[in-house]
């Protein structure tokens, strides 16, 4: 691995105006969506900030392995330039990170020390992305936003290390990404694609079979289901949430403003699974206060209808419904600007897009 040092542009296209340190008091009333509550924020190299978790044999799964996290990170586009998402000494055991491969921001993993590198899937720079690496006994699998992005033959057992685990760094590879990491989960079982998709948009705060630890980074580096608490250390590290606003303003060429509080955007892709999205969806037609349309390819070819419904009087939730006339991949992002709560929906390519009828979407009433 190699690193290019120097001044880094720290990202977060949606948070340029505000960088607010999070206190535990603030977090008490934060609703849950994607990402969840607050997140770990990193300034990128040459800063050194990260979360350190003391060594424990449980952090070295050997027979089966799943690592997953939400990330919104950047690295340098020149050279190979690898940055750590998390690791337990890449020279001896496992490491998950972002590397520039062929000019693309690529998910890389090591599961058996320094000779075990595998590249598969691309991580959108500065855009919240769910990444997962799975070992099921015979294969290593990379997932991006629930899509299988790489499959590699792998035999067990996985190797171990007595080094501490780090999030945002590694004891043998200290270059830090710029951006944010949230909801880090480590399992000693192989999670399936269906299990990843069913749970990456839900908080986990109770023990489950095979779940070793969960670090939600809601103002601290505690493990919320077990004893593997971490601690932030170094420079340029902290916790953030989305900034809040009185309203979402007006609908723009690329963003719907619904019910005066929900900023809704979409991105689409026709390239292979696990690669970067091709473009931003454009607002189509004439939206109203509660619903609107998006187009991908041309103004006379509408793709998605989305609406936000006030269900507060029924189940104390705002509802998000959508319908699409497409079979391409897209991601639909809904941000409640009043509370700084986001929900992301994915449509996977191939079959016609199913309708979304999410009556529990956002617990942000009134």
Language-model segments: residues:
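Bacterial N-terminal signal peptides
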Residues: 14-27
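Extracytoplasmic low-complexity segments
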Residues: 2, 25-47, 57, 197-246
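Aromatic-rich beta-strand patches that line glycan-recognition/binding surfaces
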Residues: 67-68, 78-92, 167, 197-200
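Extracellular/lumenal carbohydrate-interaction signature centered on repeated Trp-anchored short motifs
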Residues: 55-67, 120-129, 157-160, 173-180, ...
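Polar/charged low-complexity regulatory segments
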Residues: 246-366
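Extracellular glycan-interaction surfaces
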Residues: 34-47, 68-78, 94-157, 169-172, ...
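Extracellular glycan-interaction patches encoded by glycine-rich segments
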Residues: 45, 54-56, 112-113, 161-182, ...
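Extracellular, beta-strand-rich glycan-interacting domains
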Residues: 66-75, 175-201, 212-221
């Amino acid at each position: 691995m190699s690193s290019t040092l120097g001044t880094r542009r720290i990202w977060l296209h949606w948070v340029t105006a505000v960088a607010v340190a999070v206190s535990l008091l603030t977090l008490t009333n934060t609703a849950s969506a994607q990402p969840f509550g607050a997140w770990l924020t990193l300034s990128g190299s040459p800063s050194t900030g990260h979360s350190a978790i003391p060594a424990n044999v449980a952090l070295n799964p050997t027979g089966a392995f799943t690592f997953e996290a939400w990330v919104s990170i950047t690295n340098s586009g020149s050279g190979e330039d690898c940055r750590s998402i998390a690791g337990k000494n890449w020279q001896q055991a496992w490491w998950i990170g972002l590397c520039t491969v062929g000019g693309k921001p690529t998910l890389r993993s090591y599961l058996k020390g320094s000779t075990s590198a595998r590249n598969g899937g691309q991580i959108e720079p500065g855009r919240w992305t769910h990444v997962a690496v799975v070992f099921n006994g015979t294969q290593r699998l990379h997932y991006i936003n629930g899509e299988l992005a790489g499959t590699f033959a792998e035999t067990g057992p996985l190797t171990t290390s007595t080094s501490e685990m780090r999030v945002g760094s590694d004891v043998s590879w200290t270059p830090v990404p710029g951006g944010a990491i949230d909801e880090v989960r480590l399992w000693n079982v192989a999670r399936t694609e269906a299990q990843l998709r069913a749970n990456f948009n839900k908080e986990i705060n109770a023990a489950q079979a095979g779940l070793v630890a969960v670090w939600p980074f809601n103002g601290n580096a505690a493990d919320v289901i077990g004893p593997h608490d971490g601690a932030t250390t170094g420079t340029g590290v902290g916790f953030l949430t989305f900034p809040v606003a009185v309203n979402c303003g007006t609908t723009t060429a690329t963003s719907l403003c619904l019910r005066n509080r929900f900023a809704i955007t979409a991105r689409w892709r026709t390239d292979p699974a696990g690669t970067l999205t091709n473009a931003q969806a454009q607002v189509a037609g004439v939206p109203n206060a509660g619903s609107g349309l998006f187009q991908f390819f041309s103004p006379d070819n509408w793709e998605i209808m989305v609406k936000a419904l006030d269900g507060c009087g029924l189940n104390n939730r705002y509802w998000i419904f959508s319908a699409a006339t497409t079979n391409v991949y897209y991601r639909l992002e809904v941000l409640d600007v009043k509370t700084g709560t986001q929900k992301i929906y994915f449509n996977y390519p191939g079959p016609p897009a199913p309708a979304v009828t999410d009556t529990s979407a956002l617990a942000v009433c009134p």
